Every structure is written in C-alpha cells, then in structure tokens.
Amino acid sequence: MKKVTIEEIQSDPNFHTHKFGPFLPRNAQILILGSFPSPSSRDNNFYYMDQRNRFYKVLNYVLQENCGNEADDRKKLLRKHRIALYDVVEACIIPDAKDSNIKMPILVDLQELLKNLPHIKQIFVLGLTTTKKLFIKIPSFHNCSKPVEYEKITTFLPSTSSANIRFPTDKLEEKFKTELTKYIS
C-alpha cells in the first residue's frame, strides 16, 4: 500500500482530518479503535457523538452505567473504566459517514500511539469489514519490533454504527460484554 501524505489529498473538498486527538486516560487498560469520526463526532469534538451510533448504549450495558449524551459525561465514564479511544484513520477523503467511502486514508502510527499507553492489556478494533481491512494495513503494526504481541492482544468487534444492521443492539451488547469484561477492572 502506497503511503499517502496529507499534502497529496488536502485540496480535495471531501478531505477531513481527525479534529481531536486520541482520548488517552492515564492507566488505560483497553484501547478501542474505530474507523474515522462521523460528521457529528467531528462537529462535537469527541468519539461516537452521532445519536444513532450505539457505542455508548452498548458500553452502558456492559459497564452497568448510564452516562449521558454530553462529551464530558462520556469522558468521565471512559476514565473511570480505563478505556482509551482513537481511530485507525487520522485523515482521509470521505464525502459522508460511511466507512466504505473512505479514500486515500492516512493511518495511525500504532507503535507511537501505544508508547502513550503502557498499561494496555487489549486492543479492540470496531468494524469487521472496512476498519479491520484498514487496521491490518497499518505499517507500524507489521514493521514494529513485536507485531506478534500486537496480534495476540487485538480483538475485532462488530461496528456499533446504526448502518450495521447485521448486529441488532442486543447482540452487540452481549458480544461486547463477553469480550470487554475480561479486561475491565
């Protein structure tokens, strides 16, 4: 995969960058990677802010919590449970919120990101199609000194997007509960 630079794609009218950085609570033990922020998330400067996305509904179920709809409430919940968030794509051309429309992605430097997360026990990648394909292409995932260790601690989960009609909310809740509760202290 040819490495794309921001300079090559920034003149496109559908070019977007990750407006806000990774959410990295101190002592985070879980890293959840999505694809790229939706327009609602970019407008609200935080992850999974589209009201149709089921991420926080599922997380509330798993954690037996009830965080509100405000970014600050959601950050508090994530800090409490040592959950870090970021995305696989840092910049791309995307005309809408559909992952399948991501073009010319600039991928996260996973090795650099994990330097800031020394206590990570597990990485969860949300999305069994586009995000998984993009994650597997991350150069630092393959070129790092310990790629096997990353593979051992990486689990792919279904997307919480409302567009994911293959997984009704109750099935997402059970799948996430099974996987996340192994690592939540």
Range-by-range predicted roles:
Residues 36-40, 53-54, 90-93, 128-132, ...:
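Short, solvent-exposed loop/turn segments at secondary-structure junctions
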Residues 1-29, 51, 97-111, 139-185:
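C-terminal capping/extension of enzyme domains
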Residues 41-44, 133-136, 166-167:
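Short glycine-/acidic-enriched loop or helix-start segments at secondary-structure transitions
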Residues 80-134:
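Internal catalytic-core helix/loop-beta-alpha segment
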Residues 29-30, 122:
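Structural motif
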